[in-house]
Amino acid sequence: MRVIIIGAGMGGLFTALALRESGVFKSIHVYEQTRTPATAGAGLNVAPNGARLCKWLGIDLDGGDPKGPSGAIDGGRAAILETTRNIGPDGVVSTNPIDHNTSANDGAGFHHMHRLDLLMCLHKRVREVGPDSGVDCPIQVHMGKRLNSLEQHNDVVTATFEDGSSAQGDLLLGADGINSKVLRLVWPETPARRWTEVTCYRGLIPRDKVAALRKADGSPLDHNPIDSFSMDSRKHLTAWAMNYWVRGGELLNVWLAYYEPNAAEFEGDEGDWFSADPAEFQEKMNKAFIGDPRRDDVTALAGAMENPSKWGLYDRDAFEHWHEGRIGLLGDAAHPMLPTFGQGVNQAFEDGAALSSCFKLHGADVQKALLHYERVRHYRASRFQFSSKFAFKHLEPEDSPQRRAILKAANERDYPAFDHEDRAGSDMNWIYAYDARNVGDKLPAKRLGPWDFRPHELTKAARREVALNLWMPPVPLMGDRTVTRAEVALHNTYDDCWIIIRNKVYDFTEWKDRHPGGPYVARMFAGKDATAEFGEYHSPLAEKHMVHFCVGELVAND
């Protein structure tokens, strides 16, 4: 069989390598719209669940010289960090070892890398199995190929590009990111990407420059990253500063995010990122951390960044299906997520590994393999996709007193909409010990909703106590009418909020400030269908309570 992959980013190249391992395909062609590999971005984390998959495919994250004989970056040289440091506003530093640096044979440590280094690692491995290598099932990468249209029949998919050329395959995979053209062509009704109202600056500082950092008054930093091979985090009410080493400790990656709902440049379609003025960035952080003793350290880091860029953080509501006929999606095209879990690239790698196993299991039965892939991946990827949204919630205005009362009654944050570090349980094996190659030998049942990804320690009795004390409307709705999607779409604001869950329409307008998930739920899903993200969330007791907010049954538009 022949494979077409749209997008030669990290997910696309990894998936090409993974599909070779299935033994099912004769050739793999990857098409990329840019003429040269993209260089935008700074640091990222290949976590254990992604690193072990890289080792499986012979992708060397640790070796090599980041600058080859010609002086061009060719990948390698990850930074294997030792600890995380949370630097609090009171000056207290809590340090935790970075575990899951498992046995050397596993290859499953945390690898913090420059994005370009990782991309070049992937390109290097792909070249080793290219058309001139003489291997079975070669991978060929075609640059400068911008997708224009798709057409599929029972036995073939045809991709046509803007230069007039075309390609045919038995399978086509969209690995073309959050702005996926494959997604728009095949699923035109999918929700558009959404700016989260969080802006971040990214940049790199050479090691010698980090060592020389000083506060504005010339004194040393309170916590200079040069003193610790760690990932440092400084959270504030409306901002979050993080830094960690990449390229074997040669560069410090600096990442600073802040809540900026009025940043007009990210509300349209102008782009995802822009070059930034270091002085502007430094001033932003100076204001964000005003009155905070960590401000001098943060502004020093901001001012030292070389060629920083300004990024708008976008996501998209989960949608139910990732495949149609012989066409499938992976990575950010299927499940774009914010960077709070450090799992974006790792989930794309997991997609590729699962696809390989599904085709190894089902052979030339493309639709069955894609359905199996969707079933094993949708539920897990949705966990990260949804939860990463809420990990930025601390940058927004404080929760309502009513919601805080609910949390106090529960005595811990048991709901999936809460900041991930505050949830019950601390076992991270569900993230890092997971092996995406294990897809089972039978088609799994369909599951919706990312709701059980840590062990819950809250007792059933305590949960029942919380549910029984949820706020009730003075006049419950009757739920005895029919509602169209067009009507629901009219109620799409924070102050007039209807939401669809499993073909029922609920009015969250009065309920939102008292909802355990917080008013953020209303802001994200007003006027929309939230079934793909909430489908299996609510318990029977919660559903009994929701009846009081039910407008009626969803019907097709007239």
What does each model-found stretch correspond to?
Residues 15-26, 53-56:
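A short, Lys/Arg-enriched amphipathic alpha-helix followed by its capping loop at the start of a domain
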Residues 458-558:
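B-type heme-binding environments
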Residues 5-20, 31-34, 173-174, 201, ...:
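Conserved mid-domain beta->alpha element of the FAD-binding
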Residues 20-42:
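Glycine-rich FAD pyrophosphate-binding loop
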Residues 83, 89, 320, 357-475:
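C-terminal helical "tail/cap" subdomain of flavin- and related membrane-associated enzymes
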Residues 39-128, 137-138, 385, 395-397, ...:
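Active-site-adjacent segment of FAD-dependent monooxygenases/related oxidoreductases
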Residues 1-3:
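Extreme N-terminal starter segment of soluble prokaryotic enzymes
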Residues 85, 109, 120-303:
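Conserved FAD-binding catalytic core of PHBH/FMO-like flavoproteins
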